[in-house]
Amino acid sequence: WEALNTSEDKPLLNRPLRGAYPPGSTYKPFMALMAQELGIRTAQQAISDPGFFRLGGGYWRDDKVGGHGAVDLVKSIAVSCDTYYYQVAAEADIDEWAKFMKPFGFGQKTGIDIDGELPGILPTREWKAKRFPKDPKLHVGDQVSLGIGQGFNTFTPLQMAYATAILANRGVAFKPHLVKRVQDARTGESRLTQPAPSYSIPLKEAHVDAVLRGLAGVVKEGTGRTAFLNAKYTSGGKTGTAQVFGLRGGEYKASQIAERLRDHAWYIALAPLEKPTIALVAFVENGGFGAEAAAPIARKVMDAYFDASLLEAALKRNVDRSEQVAAAAQAAEVRRAR
């Protein structure tokens, strides 16, 4: 127990609920939606990406040397253009930004029916002043990093899945549940969890459509293409590679970096694209690139979901287990009564 409890790897940490991580580029679809809803960008407006962004004395580079050229909103998601989001972040008011993101579940608990959930961090001016009293101002330079899911942003995998589900539902939020059915061990009576809409975020259909086209582009020609090649269903997704520590002008080489300092790998997904019925997040702590570590996991989950025989088998196993548990509990009650 002592070894488990003191391990640097924290094997007892419930990461989906209590692991707070920078979301990396999986945050960009939500930034794109915010840019449209707050009037910072239209889907048609394009920027010229030279491969870097300058602001005052600050310099932020794009992941692609030389840049992506002319980039509109849909392309910015499909090719994961950092420079596009540096600019959006620099132009946004941070408190309006946080106000927009909060209903997606960022910076607050989702309310799932399990204890121990953490709220993560959705930065505001007030948060910065309280967290860093010696440097209370939230600088525009801070915002630039936030725009690509780095910096002070930290969200749980559950929050990312929740936000993705809200996006898939075009703004309708359902409280997440782990418990599908509650069964009385003595009577055998059961009650199914009936998810119901909690609230609805007013979003313009055209704005959501543009983001979904960007997510489709990730799968068709972007970083999700290899993982979802020849899939029997349509899907949209976004990879994310979140830095654990910053590099100043150096080249990232995983083989030369301690494992617990390597980048985190993310992939958010929804399918089928026309009318999503599933939304998920795959996260690999210190896994490296999202396209290589997380996206293939998402593909396996999606395949199992859409393969009726696999899904039915999994559901049957769950039913059999619950019946076995109920039978064992009833037997225990009988023994105690005797």
Residue ranges and their predicted role:
Residues W1-T26, F30-V281, E323-R338:
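Beta-lactam-recognizing serine transpeptidase/beta-lactamase-like catalytic domain environment
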Residues W266-I268, V281-E285, I297, V301:
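C-terminal soluble interaction/assembly domains
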Residues A168, V219, R299-L310:
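Short amphipathic alpha-helical signal-transduction/dimerization elements
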Residues A308-A329:
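Intrinsically disordered, low-complexity mixed-charge segments
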Residues A20, G287-G288:
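Short strand->helix junction
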Residues G288-F289, D307:
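Short beta-strands and strand-coil junctions in structured, solvent-facing domains, enriched
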Residues Y85-Q87, F289-E292:
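Extracytoplasmic/secreted cell-surface and envelope-processing proteins
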Residues M160, K175, G290-A295, R299-D303:
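Short, charged, low-complexity patches
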